[in-house]
């Protein structure tokens, strides 16, 4: 199958680019070597914490630790100086949880005597003994994407069923090593049922969780009795029970994924019944249960993701029935409520951070700005990215702020963090410096309807675009045809067929135009595999520049020219 990939122009180049990145380690602009372990970021505007108004200071880093923050530091001769005069320094972001760099374990084979009503734990998705450490790859392109977005620490979740395993906390630093701060941190849990076997329903998942928890409590009692009393039969402990002991003894929390109001209620009900430590994660729809969350005392990690507004933009204003109008109103109300939920958590005084699971790194900053535009304060947004998750994860002594003795995790941006034109120029993770290209942006920005501010000219997106993508191995390209149907963008894209037989075509999915930025996805099938390719670029007149990204392979520059504008629908 590798030969088949390498026959293809675009996919072959992507694979070549992927392989060239496998030795990636960045502390100089080329990312190939670390030239020093001592850095001085001089005269930057430093925000030490979410409540800090910011002031000019120098940050001195040595061996991955912040050794000083101030205005009168003595810099060692070996320090590499990063001029920070026009830069703004913030603590590196912390993902309360995520799946970056995590691979899926192999499915267990069903035994010949398999009984669907009583399957083995591993087949039923009950694998609390698994550790995220064993499935993490530091060199994954997902890790780089999130680091580029400003994230320097993440708790990672193992993939799997209702009890997939134990989480780990790691630093997104040296790509050549797995930089774990803590292992076996918490038990990941969710309401994911099993297909074709017990537990096959949400109620069944709850019952099974109780069963596993209570049987482990009985085993602990049995072990205590065996240790203190003669004549007692030796307890037989299963791998599941052994892994659950720390949870039952309240040494480890349960990190429960609960996206909906119903799942949140169920997770809190289980916690009240059984008494384990609870952290709620993956929250999406929670406006109606905020009081319940607050009364439970559980910290929360909300999804760093907002609903797509396409359904709102596609609503028609003419020729629709009253029932349809009412439905439109309900959809719009639900959408607007979702945008305000984070602000409601802040108002309620609930400690919350962010979960990056299922979110896109490229959309993080726009998501944060949208939350702020809908009532979340900038201070609370920064706290949810730094000090709050540090507290929730129990790592506030080493991360979350820019102070002497903390891990050297920080971002350097071109302006204050939540301004529209702000970009991240450097990320320091575990003392490793990662440099990123700063793109020049026009002062005239686009609006949601494709109009340019201060101008009556519309951004032209419909038509045929000829594109090329550059990778370390060369270039490849094709045509992008964009059409608009009832206000919704769509179309097709051509690319080099992985089979080596000329060009192939695929429909464009999830297309959107935000300001001047056009983004969309398409699927490439080859050798039984399906790859999701994301293209995102900024349009200026009849040209577009951006990136073509493929999970596990990386991101590559892409350029396009509009050759046939205003294609008729």
List PLM regions with ranges:
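Acidic, glycine-enriched loop/beta-strand segments at the rims
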Residues: 28-33, 46-58, 70-71, 377-385, ...
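His/Asp/Glu-enriched, well-ordered alpha-helical/loop segment
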Residues: 43, 105-106, 112-121, 253, ...
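Polyanionic/metal-chelating signatures
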Residues: 139-142, 147-285, 423-424, 429, ...
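Central antiparallel beta-sheet cores of small beta-barrel/beta-sandwich binding domains
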Residues: 459-539, 545-566
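Histidine-rich, glycine-flanked metal-binding segment
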Residues: 28-32, 37, 46, 50-92, ...
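Active-site core of metal-dependent hydrolases
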Residues: 231-335, 352-353, 391-393, 399, ...
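Extracellular/periplasmic ectodomains of large secreted or surface enzymes and adhesion receptors
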Residues: 26, 36, 343-347, 353, ...
